[in-house]
Amino acid sequence: MSDKKELLWQSRFSEPFDRDALRFSSSVHIDKALFREDIEGSIAHVTMLAEQDIISDAECADLVQGLREIEEELASGTLVPHWEDEDIHTVIENRLKEKIGQTAGKIHSGRSRNDQVATDTRLYLRKKIAELQDAVQAMQQMLIGKAETYKETIIFGYTHLQRAQPISAGHYYLAWFSMFRRDRERLRDLLRRVNISPLGAAAFAGSTLPLNPARTAELLAFDDIFSNSIDAVSDRDILIEFISACSIMMMHLSRFAEDLILWSSYEFGYLEISDAFATGSSLMPQKKNADIAELVRGKTGRVYGNLVSMLTIMKGLPLSYNRDMQEDKQPLFDTAETTISSMRIFTKLIGHTTLKVERLRSLTSEDLSLATEIAEYLVSRNLPFREAHRITGKIVTFSIGEGITLPRITLEQFRTFSPLFDSAIYDSLKPEASVNSKKSHGSCSFRSVEAQLAEARAQMQENR
């Protein structure tokens, strides 16, 4: 660190800061990712200072020009932050001083690094929320396409990882659509709390200068300004909320990934993953592995860990600002990039999967998953459900014992369990008839899936 590069807080101290302590406390290797947001916030701040006659218009022009040049230098890599600079704010201010001299010191009038970094973080979050919403929207469009393609393909629905009832594959894909819709809603709701400017709170108690926080909020396209200067700089709940929303989103992706991994296995054989999204084995030449799905499933743990990390960092901190909060950047940045990249690659993966329709047709036509239809058939004949359930259980036991599937049980055999059976039972034991017999709202029938598709398309139009 050259003699010209003084730490921003160093003037009060008679001894230089220990180099090992500086290296330990330096965050520039992480927070350099905020250089655009930092410069954007600084330009808004000095513009407001000039409008409030705290600095001159000429000084403002010099500051803005210098900041724009530094932004280009950082973007191009001609200005490389060093750990001795402590943080990205110091990098920018020191470089500004080299460019325009002592006027650079006026950039911090009425501002602390506390409200500065809080502003940077909110600007960053706003951008990442927009990117993530776009990624989720692309996933939803993909799911609508899959649901349209496979709306009349019958697959097994599962509970406890056991075949439960036949359903439309379109119904399955639209279930994920609904989950990701709530994920988008969480982000949209969070944005209301993120898009509030903390700039003007200073260190935590405000400033004696005639600042205009509403003006900087306007310049930075914030919807509102802080109401309490302590709160503005001392909480990180919006970061925790963002990581929490991402954790839920990654949980959805992880569950979806698990289905793809299982369904693409030889044991299930329901689905084929394109070679472009599968890998092999360095030893076993026959292998085709669902590695992308497995990686998304694994990365979910990273995001969960980031959530616990943030909650632990903030646990028990006294008001207002504490240096512990410097540790918020790594979990935030990692969560944003991991979730966005996972959503994007998983959307592409879904586009490179194909259901094995003929195999599914063969499997669903000869399976015990039609047992519920027998119970509901008896209920439609005015038998109490509990009795219908008991009788159907006996029929299933008989089917397994005789080694025959439910549709192959003769009417005479059915009637040994209940005289209510007639030839109409066989209509219920066809997978397509089973699916289309569902009359309740949001069910798996082809008609219901078509209505759900129309609703999904309408929602996507509204959210554009």
From Swiss-Prot:
InterPro entries found in the cross-reference section: Arg_succ_lyase_C, Argininosuccinate_lyase, Fumarase/histidase_N, Fumarate_lyase_CS, Fumarate_lyase_fam, Fumarate_lyase_N, L-Aspartase-like
Cell location: Cytoplasm
Keywords from the named record: Amino-acid biosynthesis, Arginine biosynthesis, Cytoplasm, Lyase
GO MF annotations in UniProt: argininosuccinate lyase activity
Coiled coil: none
Reactions that this protein is recorded to catalyse: 2-(N(omega)-L-arginino)succinate = fumarate + L-arginine
Listed pathway(s): Amino-acid biosynthesis; L-arginine biosynthesis; L-arginine from L-ornithine and carbamoyl phosphate: step 3/3
Keyword Lipoprotein among record annotations: no
GO cellular component terms, A-Z: cytosol
UniProt EC number: 4.3.2.1
Gene3D superfamilies found in the cross-reference section: Fumarase/aspartase (C-terminal domain), Fumarase/aspartase (Central domain), Fumarase/aspartase (N-terminal domain)
A single BP term in Gene Ontology: L-arginine biosynthetic process
Any matching Pfam family: ASL_C2
Main location group: cytoplasm
Family the UniProt entry places it in: Belongs to the lyase 1 family. Argininosuccinate lyase subfamily.
Protein name as annotated: Argininosuccinate lyase
Organism: Chlorobium phaeobacteroides (strain DSM 266 / SMG 266 / 2430)
Annotated gene: argH
